Amino acid sequence: MKSRNLSILLASLLVIAGAVFATGAGAAGEVPPPPAIGATIEDFTLPDADNKAHSLKSLAGKNGTVLLFVSVQCPVSNAYNERMAKLAEDYKAKGIAVIGINSNVAEDTAAVKAHAAEHKLAFPILKDAGNKIADKLGATVTPEAYFLDTNNKLIYHGRIDNARNPAQLETSDLRNALDAALGGKTIDKAEAKAFGCSIKRA
């Protein structure tokens, strides 16, 4: 009898464990796929670290807009702080705006504001509470870039470049896409898989 009860208990535990792992897999699978290249991204509104609301339309550049999903704590995102700041500075004069989006549930607006000041991130960083925009765009990691043309069509999606360590930099995918668009050329590589820390969703 004891042996039978033990078998039933073990079987029950296996069923529960299976349900837990299945739930975990399902949660990961709930992130929608990103829009296809060429898709139009609808306008949205998010608050900045001072709780002032900004729409995509109000911040868009006259020659295009880059959306960068960023993080306060992610070491990969932090490895790109200087490069992101330089990117925003370099392309602002060329009519391309850079907008940061923080979708991590554990990083509040105070942390976002302090982090931006510490690392001299002069571009606006919006707080995506409930990760609604991250879900809308299928963003999964930080940093992750989306480049929109003047009609808000997605023309590049993915990594900023190939290397977390700038000493190993070989391909500046995002800059190449921006330069091609500014020159009226077709972007040769419109997608390059982003890498970094997973976005911690609500």
Predicted region positions:
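C-terminal segment of classical bacterial N-terminal signal peptides
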Residues: I16-G24
